């Protein structure tokens, strides 16, 4: 009798007749097969067992008495015969389908309580379950490929005897075909091995020792270099990288931003975009590595139990995570330095997550360029915001402006220049031509006009200074002439007062430029107001002092130049001039306020006369008095003791004759004779 079940029935029990043999196949694609010869040899070896003979007979006669739990199970054909598990009549109700499934798939049978009778599991049953191979899962713990190949070859050619049953001793020979059975014996032995726990503990100690050593080395390296921090748990490298130290990038970012050109700014922005791409690539590679490690961990846990892969994978995860974290921190530090050099805000947050992708970076860059272009321009709210921005790109404008200033004297590009500029800026030739037309009108022409105006102003200033200079010189010449006239006019008056009968020879010596229209008397001179111009007096005084120190061009000597060298006992030789005479001489002529007793050049004749009067007393020259023109009263010689003077015509005539008969050469000779006395 054949039965076919759709799906997965919860429990399979034998029929009442006890002759039903069933085979439970969880994976029909890996069913076990054997040939007719194997069946015959199996029947010959087990001929003493009647139950086994009945099973073989039923198997040969009823090839379709099987139960398939999969709807896609293949239909049996004449060339294939399946192994059936014989079930006796009294054991059919006690053994369930779960036990058969566990036996076929290599798991130890579970003790289940049945409603139909007691159930006992024989130790050989467990051994058969452990020795029955499972389907291969693609995992092997062997370290050598040769051993694995030898083991698989040994399993292919070595038959496995599975025996179960308490007293009947049914044996079924299962031969592994070329496709291989399910599972290697090594995995089943690992599960039931008593050395598994001890080996795992020993491996944990070795791995922990190595990890502690590596932690110490990494801490020492981080203290010296400062590039990598302490170890962090697995999974924090992608989320918490770059939090504490950023290495050389932070040092480079410590500098203050400087003014950058357009080319330098574009280069830094391109570098920043490349760094952001590298950062995303690093994160993607770490996620891929983490997924692969999770697959390995799940394979370990499936083979050796939950938590068994920690000893094998923890060290590798920590090492690789440290490398990824250091790489990410370095890239994040360089991005931060680029942001500071550009004067932008940091795009790396405090926890180290890079905020924003390449799209956000491009959007931020476009917004910044738009803000710079519209700087200082306030748009009315009624303007349409959706209207596209007018004007050429800033980079193209900078290139065109640079060419304009380089060829400022002739800003008319040729066709070749226009093609070259169009390639550099990415514009068309017509756009370049239009820009230069507008630039010459709006930029170049106003600059040229402004330069021309400044040049004209400078020329006007230069012409004004050149016209002003001759006028100033003429004014200064006139002022100097008037000053010289003021200086020379008192000399002429004094000479006239001193020499009323002089024929004019002394006037040429003193340098008078013209004769006065009328003669001045001492009374008129006394009535003139005193000039208080102290600046002209100071100039004249300095000039007089300079002339006192030198020798005159006509050979004469100043009277007062050597006056300070006389002895006190020699002062009696000079005449005594009254205070009125001094005042009259001081304030005479053009109101210049210069005293004539300071040693003016025209006083030489007077000094010589005085000296001649002292040396020649027999001539009867009156001392200390002055003869005025048209004065009828004549005075006689004055005495120093203050006595009265007698007026006689003889004395006046003698005085006039002596005055007119004076010789200038004799005066000079007399002065030359007195030089040794003055010097001594």
UniProtKB/Swiss-Prot annotation:
Main location, first listed in the record: nucleus
Annotated region of DNA binding: 385-447
Compositional bias annotation for Low complexity: 41-65, 136-153
Database matches in InterPro entries: HD, Homeodomain-like_sf, KN_HD, POX_dom, TALE_homeobox
Region (BELL domain): 264-335
Region (Disordered): 35-72, 127-178, 220-257, 458-523
Polar residues compositional bias, start-end: 471-488
Keyword Isomerase: no
SUPFAM superfamilies recorded: Homeodomain-like (SSF46689)
Cytoplasm listed as a keyword: no
Comp. bias (Gly residues): 240-251
Region (SR/KY domain): 193-209
Comment, domains: The SR/KY and BELL domains are responsive for the interaction between the TALE/BELL proteins and the TALE/KNOX proteins.
Stated name of the protein: BEL1-like homeodomain protein 1
Organism: Arabidopsis thaliana (Mouse-ear cress)
């Amino acid at each position: 009798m054949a039965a076919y079940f759709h799906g997965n029935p919860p429990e399979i029990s034998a029929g009442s007749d006890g002759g039903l043999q069933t085979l439970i196949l969880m994976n029909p694609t890996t069913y076990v097969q054997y040939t007719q010869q194997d069946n015959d040899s199996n029947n010959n070896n087990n001929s003493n067992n009647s139950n086994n003979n009945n099973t073989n007979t039923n198997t040969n006669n009823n090839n379709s008495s099987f139960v398939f739990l999969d709807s896609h199970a293949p239909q049996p054909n004449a060339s294939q015969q399946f192994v059936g598990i014989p079930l006796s009549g009294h054991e059919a109700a006690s053994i369930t389908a779960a036990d058969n499934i566990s036996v076929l798939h290599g798991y130890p049978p579970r003790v289940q309580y049945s409603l139909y009778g007691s159930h006992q599991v024989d130790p050989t049953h467990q051994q058969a379950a452990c020795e029955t191979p499972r389907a291969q899962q693609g995992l092997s713990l062997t370290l050598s490929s040769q051993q694995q190949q030898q083991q698989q070859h040994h399993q292919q050619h070595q038959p496995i005897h599975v025996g179960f049953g308490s007293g009947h001793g049914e044996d079924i020979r299962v031969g592994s075909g070329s496709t291989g059975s399910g599972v290697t014996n090594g995995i089943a032995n690992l599960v039931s091995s008593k050395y598994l726990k001890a080996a795992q503990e020993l491996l944990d100690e070795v791995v922990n020792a190595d990890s502690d050593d590596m932690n110490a080395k990494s801490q020492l390296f981080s203290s010296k270099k400062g590039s990598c921090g302490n170890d962090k748990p697995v999974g924090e490298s992608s989320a918490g990288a770059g939090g504490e130290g950023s290495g050389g990038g932070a040092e480079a970012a410590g500098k203050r931003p400087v003014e950058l050109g357009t080319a330098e700014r574009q280069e830094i922005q391109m570098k920043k975009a490349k760094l952001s791409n590298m950062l995303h690539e690093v994160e993607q590679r770490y996620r891929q590595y983490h997924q692969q490690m999770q697959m390995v961990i799940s394979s370990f846990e499936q083979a050796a139990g939950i938590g068994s892969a920690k000893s094998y994978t923890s060290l590798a995860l920590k090492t690789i995570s440290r490398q990824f974290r250091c790489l990410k921190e370095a890239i994040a530090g360089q991005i931060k330095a680029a942001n500071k050099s550009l004067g932008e805000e940091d795009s790396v947050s405090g926890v180290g997550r890079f905020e924003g992708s390449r799209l956000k970076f491009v959007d931020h860059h476009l917004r910044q360029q738009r803000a710079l272009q519209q700087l200082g321009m306030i748009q009315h709210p009624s303007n349409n915001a959706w209207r596209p921005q007018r004007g050429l790109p800033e980079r193209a404008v900078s290139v065109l402006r640079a060419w304009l200033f380089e060829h400022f004297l002739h800003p008319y590009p040729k066709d070749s220049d226009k093609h070259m500029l169009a390639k550099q800026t990415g514009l068309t030739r017509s756009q370049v031509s239009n820009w230069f037309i507008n630039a010459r009108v709006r930029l170049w022409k106003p600059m040229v006009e402004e330069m021309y105006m400044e040049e004209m102003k400078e020329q006007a200033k230069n012409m004004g200074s050149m016209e002003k200079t001759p006028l100033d010189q003429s004014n200064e010449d006139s002022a100097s002439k008037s000053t010289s006239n003021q200086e020379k006019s008192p000399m002429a008056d004094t000479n006239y007062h001193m020499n009323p009968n002089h024929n004019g020879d002394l006037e040429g010596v003193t340098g008078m430029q013209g004769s006065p229209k009328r003669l001045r008397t001492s009374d008129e001179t006394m009535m003139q107001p005193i000039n208080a111009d102290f600046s002209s007096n100071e100039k004249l005084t300095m000039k007089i002092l300079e002339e006192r120190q030198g020798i005159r061009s006509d050979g004469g000597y100043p009277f007062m130049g050597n006056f300070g060298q006389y002895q006190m006992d020699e002062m009696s030789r000079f005449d005594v001039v009254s205070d009125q005479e001094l005042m009259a001489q001081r304030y005479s002529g053009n109101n210049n306020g210069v005293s004539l007793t300071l040693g003016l050049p025209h006083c030489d004749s007077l000094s010589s006369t005085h000296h001649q009067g002292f040396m020649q007393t027999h001539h009867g020259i009156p001392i200390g008095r002055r003869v005025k023109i048209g004065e009828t009263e004549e005075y006689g010689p004055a005495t120093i003791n203050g006595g009265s003077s007698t007026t006689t015509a003889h004395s006046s005539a003698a005085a006039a004759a002596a005055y007119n008969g004076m010789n200038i050469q004799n005066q000079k000779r007399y002065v030359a004779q007195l030089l040794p006395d003055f010097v001594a």
